[in-house]
């Protein structure tokens, strides 16, 4: 039996209940015969259309079968019930009474479509993936495909999701604390507005106001630099930013600097819930951290009993200390919240959580092996977001970073202000020096003068800050209130972030864990411990790449109980199949005969 015969047979056999045709965009559509539309048979052009590379006759036949709708009674099918269904029927040009096909009938890969139709516009402006989006097999691959082509609709969080988010935040704040700057920032903003109004100033250079792009600077200073400092000083950190670049064509992650900018390299971001730096043989061993704390207390001046670290010395010194404690290793943990006091029973769900921790561990390996590589990765990350890595941060952003993390940034900011190198060659050779008017903002409106010496006015402003904050601003802020020679930028923060990753490059352990907690009480239900396996992760990465490349026909779940939670269940054939003991019994005799013929063809091939 030839492929052409099957095509003709399919066109003739299906004419009794549905028709398949291609529109001018190459979009495979399924129509109902009661609608008066032009009908075309499936022609030879289908062989080369909407598929990746040469396909065998059998593969094409399989695609034809999968695109068919296998429902018994078309007239009783429910109408489209939600936004996701309406979107996917529109995007796939489907007749609303037909069920969803099992494969993508468009010319776009899932990654391409996600990057042009997405509820979250940031994915259009900066096409990318997340670690969770690589975990396509955790529940149902077919649902993942439908969600992408429905436009990645953002749905309101459920009660369980909101409670889980609160628990994550509670654990994070219990470890890292929160410095509330709302009152002091309101004071600075109102004072700035008064100055701008009195002197008719325009904030062309972002000196006075907060730029939206500065949020990434706050993120890097907090969730990379501060968190990794906590890891080396306190043995633990939560909510740490990680990322890598997945080459979708090679189906592997980028490991060299030259490949980062390759168009096929897709940014993949994630936030690991917890990293611990510990002796796996003795969790009560804190000798390393006692040594680090002793070093900090002896070597650095303190303000408010907090050492002011000189990062130019810190990195090499701490690496030398770590070398004396070879037993300490990193452990990566993902936290899952559960409304009931039991862990998931489905193996695919457990495996998905395991691979999530594997990705985090691997990303940290990539970023920690070489500071220059991590530096380039971070710069590319910012550039893909449309950010200028050499644009000076707003004065308010710089103040926020200084206030929250003065123990890490004060000495560095002195170096930038004086135009001195920070001790990281890639940054020092690429930095752009320009005047940065940091001091102009910190003057009371009534004392402000654009072209006069303002030292005395600065003191008055600092006295006013004392009404909101007990920090010794005369020691930490006053020396910086001048025109800096080198402005703080994302490039600077990328440099320091990269150096913090590199501290741990030789201490990547092979243990990852998934911790299950009750959503409402926070109590630990169970902890799954895994041994990192790079080979397993490579296989998982290839599978995920095939999905996003459009090379993979997604596998539907074989656990029909999962279908009751799916937003596509009313138009998906899988739950219908699950309700009958023999799926062929519900298919019309013409289609059943066709399927039997195909079985014979498979035997003949």
Swiss-Prot record:
Cofactor note: Binds 1 [4Fe-4S] cluster.
Alphabetical list of Pfam families matching this protein: Exo5
Molecular-function annotations in GO: 4 iron, 4 sulfur cluster binding; DNA binding; metal ion binding; single-stranded DNA 5'-3' DNA exonuclease activity
Function summary: Single strand DNA specific 5' exonuclease involved in mitochondrial DNA replication and recombination. Releases dinucleotides as main products of catalysis. Has the capacity to slide across 5'double-stranded DNA or 5'RNA sequences and resumes cutting two nucleotides downstream of the double-stranded-to-single-stranded junction or RNA-to-DNA junction, respectively.
Assigned keywords, A-Z: 4Fe-4S, DNA-binding, Exonuclease, Hydrolase, Iron, Iron-sulfur, Magnesium, Metal-binding, Mitochondrion, Nuclease, Transit peptide
EC id: 3.1.-.-
One BP term from GO: interstrand cross-link repair
Principal EC category: hydrolase
Main location: mitochondrion
Binding locations of [4Fe-4S] cluster: 140, 563, 566, 572
Transit peptide extent on chain: 1-17
Domain of life, per lineage: Eukaryota
Subcellular location(s) of the protein: Mitochondrion
One annotated Gene Ontology cellular component of this protein: nucleus
The species this protein was found in: Candida tropicalis (strain ATCC MYA-3404 / T1) (Yeast)
Subunit structure: Monomer.
UniProt similarity note: Belongs to the EXO5 family.
Annotated protein name in UniProt: Exonuclease V, mitochondrial
Entry cofactors: Mg(2+); [4Fe-4S] cluster
